Swiss-Prot record:
Pfam families: Fer4_12, Mob_synth_C, Radical_SAM
Assembly and oligomerization: Monomer and homodimer.
Classification lineage: Bacteria, Pseudomonadati, Pseudomonadota, Alphaproteobacteria, Magnetococcales
SMART domains per record: Elp3 (SM00729)
Descriptive protein name: GTP 3',8-cyclase
Length: 326
């Protein structure tokens, strides 16, 4: 039975944050003084597995593991393997900064991860450091991308948050890199999520401005729109030769009318909309001994409270991206 909200949207996709911690500090994601929650506040893998089983039973078929950085959570492959065995699970994917993929890519594939999205905001070492902090480098992320390709975690999607005057000049280089390696490259508009996200909105570039830079790099005739289903996400895709690029325009062309997703935070809150403050506590009833039927009722009630649209243009989200799972 499909999970349908009051606006007749089928909710089929859950983003699951397994950790608020991250080994990088990207300037649009978290401010330097921001501290992560204590691990004791996170759901255990046993608790998480029970909740994910309820979501699968209710009609969620696609799961994406996120963070923070999900690969800093020990024994993640064990969680994946258990999730992969659940009836109704169609796909498990992963969002990562790529730094730890050379170590874990093969095990993740064997456990049941189908594909990965990897963040790469700059190919230039100094630009990378300016955006992402002192940990990691473009070469280390590239190594993660190659490890994902070798392990068969495909298609590999590379996400670039585009900021005017910061990294927008690298768009042509990113397109070339994606074409050389057969990657799907996605450009993402900045969003006012958390203090860090609000601070970078002065560098906001719309998807139209981003696409214009792509056209300048490859020629207008070379950028061919792709129609038809391209997965459960909100990106609009274009073909450039044998590669693909996409744009995610949460600000300039929101996709709320077709939103199919919710988010489960590491501390057990169900976030109904990335741009709203609505959230439902699942950890407390879980730890107080709620039955499966009681958990199902809480989730079903939450789905009907999912808002019609985000309020990014009216107010910013106070929660940091690391606390929301992206």
């Amino acid at each position: 039975m499909p999970l349908v909200d009051r606006f007749n949207r089928t909710i089929s996709y859950l983003r699951v944050s397994v950790s608020e911690q991250c080994n990088m500090r990207c300037n649009y994601c978290r401010v330097p003084e921001q501290e992560s929650q204590l691990r004791e506040q996170w759901l255990s893998f046993a608790e998480l597995s029970r909740l994910l089983a309820r979501f699968a039973q209710l009609g969620i078929g696609r799961f994406r593991l996120t963070g923070g950085e999900p690969l800093v959570r020990k024994d993640l492959a064990q969680l994946v393997a258990g999730l992969h065995q659940l009836a109704g699970v169609e796909e498990i994917s992963l969002s990562t900064n790529g730094l730890l993929l050379p170590r874990f890519a093969k095990a993740l594939k064997e456990a049941g991860i189908a594909r990965v999205n990897i963040s790469l905001d700059s190919l230039d070492p100094s630009g990378f450091q300016k955006i992402c902090g002192d940990v990691g480098s473009p070469d280390e992320v590239k190594a993660g991308i190659l490890a994902a390709l070798e392990a068969g975690l495909t298609p590999v999607k590379v996400n670039m948050v585009v900021m005017g005057g910061v990294n927008d000049h690298e768009i042509p280089h990113m397109v070339t890199f994606a074409r050389e390696h057969g990657l799907t490259l996605r450009f993402i508009e900045t969003m006012p999520i958390g203090k860090a996200g609000q601070q970078v909105m002065g560098s906001y570039l719309s998807s139209d401005a981003i696409l214009e830079r792509v056209r300048q790099a490859v020629g207008a005739q070379a950028l061919i729109p792709i129609t038809g289903f391209k997965g459960p996400g909100p990106a609009c895709y274009y073909r450039i030769g044998d590669a693909e690029v996409g744009v995610i325009s949460a600000m300039s062309r929101h996709f709320c009318d077709t939103c199919n997703r919710m988010r489960l935070t590491a501390d057990g809150h169900l976030v109904l909309c990335l741009g709203q403050q609505d959230r439902v506590d699942l950890k407390t009833p879980l730890r107080e001994g709620a039955s499966d039927a009681q958990l199902d009722e809480i989730i079903l009630t939450a789905v009907q409270a999912k808002p019609k649209a985000h309020d990014f243009l009216q107010s910013a989200s106070p929660h940091a991206m690391t606390a929301l799972g992206g």
